[in-house]
């Protein structure tokens, strides 16, 4: 039984939030063009110890994109690797990135590093992947961050138990000493793909049963559970002490298509910005508040309705993508206490 002090009780939750999440109406309706609200930017690194989640966006690095995140009212960014943002950068280049973030008034919350297959069946590729990821952990530390998001690896044809054992061994033997030395943590996103075997609660539990250290956890994304017909709220409770980061993304399911093609077919689901799919955000975010999650909730914008194709490499977001980020923030912040907006 959990200590009564482990979670916020209802009285504390209402006191901090000012209202119950269930009493709030939905926000974030569409508009032809939504102007970025000029929210006063807080200094980079603001409120790192605040006992509630920080809203952020997942983005490639560019000064313009960091500036937009701050102007749009987000508290941080989760940055993906690229030519101008990677473990091979010099100290002076990293100093410039941090200076850019300070100027924008935004905090780099964490980094993503999905490419390495930590348990690649090929010994040479496996060793190279592990060395590459250790550099990512060091890069995280050099940036002053505390978390790296990744995948759990994959071995085609191997059983779930064997893959869990392999991933746990890699973490315990290779990554944990580095994490402890640098005071960082890592976690995998539950995205169903070949090089990411641990995307169900059963697989997650098998891994964690072999890894006592809380420096390995989850980059929890409710949208992926929805399309696997797994309840993300129940999963969040089950792994409450292993949620180190959160992706905010929704899933829309088109039932008429699903009834025709089945779950093995195509076109019956798509990712949406938060609030425009079927994730129960009231229940999910209430779980995060009750377990006192204080990490980053990062909007992972994969909603094609609020985007423009073939623009990801541009230095700034197109207006339609900005609109999606703005709607996502407006929707999510109604459930979170202590917002600046």
Where are these regions (language model features)?
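N-terminal secretory signal peptides
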Residues: 1-9
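Active-site acidic/histidine proton-transfer and metal-coordination neighborhood
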Residues: 17-19, 23-28, 43, 47, ...
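C-terminal segment of N-terminal export signals and the immediately downstream linker at the start
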Residues: 29-61, 71-72
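Hydrophobic faces of well-ordered beta-strands that scaffold small-molecule active sites
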Residues: 53-59, 77-79, 108-113, 148-150, ...
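Conserved, mostly hydrophobic/aromatic
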Residues: 69, 77, 101, 129, ...
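Glycine-rich, proline-tolerant flexible connector loops at the mouths of alpha/beta enzymes
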Residues: 79-98, 155-158
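Gly/Pro-rich active-site loop or hairpin
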Residues: 88, 197-201, 205, 224-294, ...
């Amino acid at each position: 039984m959990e200590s009564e002090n482990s979670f916020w009780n209802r009285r504390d939750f209402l006191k901090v939030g000012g209202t119950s999440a269930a009493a709030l109406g939905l926000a974030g309706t569409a508009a032809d063009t939504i102007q970025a609200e000029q929210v006063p930017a807080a200094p980079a690194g603001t409120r790192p110890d605040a006992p509630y989640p920080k809203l952020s966006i997942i983005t490639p690095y560019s000064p313009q994109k960091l500036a937009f995140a701050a102007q749009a009212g987000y508290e941080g960014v989760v940055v993906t690797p690229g030519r101008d943002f990677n473990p091979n950068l010099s100290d002076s280049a990293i100093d410039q990135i941090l200076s850019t973030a300070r100027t924008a008034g935004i905090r780099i919350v964490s980094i993503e590093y999905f490419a390495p297959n930590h348990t690649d069946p090929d010994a040479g590729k496996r060793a190279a992947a592990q060395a590459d990821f250790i550099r990512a952990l060091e890069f995280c530390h050099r940036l002053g961050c505390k978390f790296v998001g990744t995948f759990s690896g994959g071995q085609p044809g191997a059983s779930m138990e064997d893959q869990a054992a392999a991933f746990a061994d890699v973490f315990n033997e290779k990554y944990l000493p580095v994490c402890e030395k640098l005071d960082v943590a890592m976690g995998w996103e539950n995205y169903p793909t070949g090089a990411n075997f641990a995307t169900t609660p059963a697989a997650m539990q098998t891994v964690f049963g072999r890894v006592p250290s809380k420096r390995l956890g989850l980059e929890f994304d409710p949208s992926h559970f929805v399309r696997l017909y797994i309840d993300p709220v129940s999963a969040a409770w089950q792994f409450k002490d292993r949620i180190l980061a959160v992706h905010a993304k929704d899933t829309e399911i088109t039932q008429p298509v699903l009834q025709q093609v089945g779950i093995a077919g195509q076109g019956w689901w798509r990712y949406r910005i938060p609030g425009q799919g079927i994730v129960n955000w009231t229940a999910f975010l209430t779980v995060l508040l009750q377990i006192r999650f204080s990490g980053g909730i990062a909007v992972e914008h994969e909603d094609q309705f609020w985007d423009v194709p073939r623009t990801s490499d541009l230095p700034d977001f197109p207006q339609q993508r900005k609109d999606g980020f703005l709607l996502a923030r407006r929707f999510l912040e109604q459930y979170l206490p202590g917002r600046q907006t």
